[in-house]
Amino acid sequence: MSSAPLSATELAGMIDHTLLTPEATHNDVAKLVADAKKYGTWSVCVSPSMLPLNLDMGDVHLAVVCGFPSGKHTSAVKAAEAREAIAAGAEEVDMVINLGLVKEGRWEDVTADIAAVKQAVPDPKILKVIIESAVLTDDEIVRACQAAEKAGADFVKTSTGFHPRGGASVEAVKVMADTVGGRLGVKASGGIRDYQTACAMVEAGATRLGVSSTAKILAGAPTE
């Protein structure tokens, strides 16, 4: 990877501009979309109950979360939620892995859970799998990424940003990127609030960033 600093435009093109707070309103989401268009972010990421947006999205893509934030929903419920979101205009779905199955080492069931959602998110729609890396060992991170790849997912993602153990770390992103080897994208999310941290995640192998502090992050980029 080049050591040249990322410009605001380059970084914005990697950002899912995110609003997932429970109290978010439709007016808040309308502002989110307006800001995403202004900054040139790749997408906005919102809760599925906000769909359909019925907004002029311009070039901004639409992502939604699924099984969020616990991942403890049944596979059928996750798949139904994803299917409804796609029908309502979502182009990308960020699902949460079942951490209980991960901790029990039930990798076939982990894979099946992801595969059930992927069936509801057919290509060229994008499925990202949130593995909640802060609560996993490095071996569990590797196995979770392998399960996501086997199930046909398009990205692995560090975190919901809602777990008390924390969000993305450079170390976890490196493990994830090494595991998927460019075959899947890697999304870092949770706790990325400034330009330096965002660039560190990209340097570690992240190809997408989930952030809510987009304006602050881009303000730290060198002048173009």
From Swiss-Prot:
The cross-references to SMART domains, in alphabetical order and at most eight, read:
DeoC
Known catalytic reactions: 2-deoxy-D-ribose 5-phosphate = D-glyceraldehyde 3-phosphate + acetaldehyde
Question: Biological process GO annotation list?
Answer: 2-deoxyribose 1-phosphate catabolic process; carbohydrate catabolic process; deoxyribonucleotide catabolic process
Enzyme category, top tier: lyase
Source taxon at top rank:
Bacteria
GO terms for MF? deoxyribose-phosphate aldolase activity
Output the InterPro entries linked to this UniProt entry. Answer: Aldolase_TIM, DeoC, DeoC/FbaB/LacD_aldolase, DeoC_typeI
Q: What is its EC number?
A: 4.1.2.4
A GO cellular component annotation in the UniProt record:
cytoplasm
What family does the Swiss-Prot or TrEMBL record give for this protein?
Belongs to the DeoC/FbaB aldolase family. DeoC type 1 subfamily.
The protein's name in its UniProt record: Deoxyribose-phosphate aldolase 2
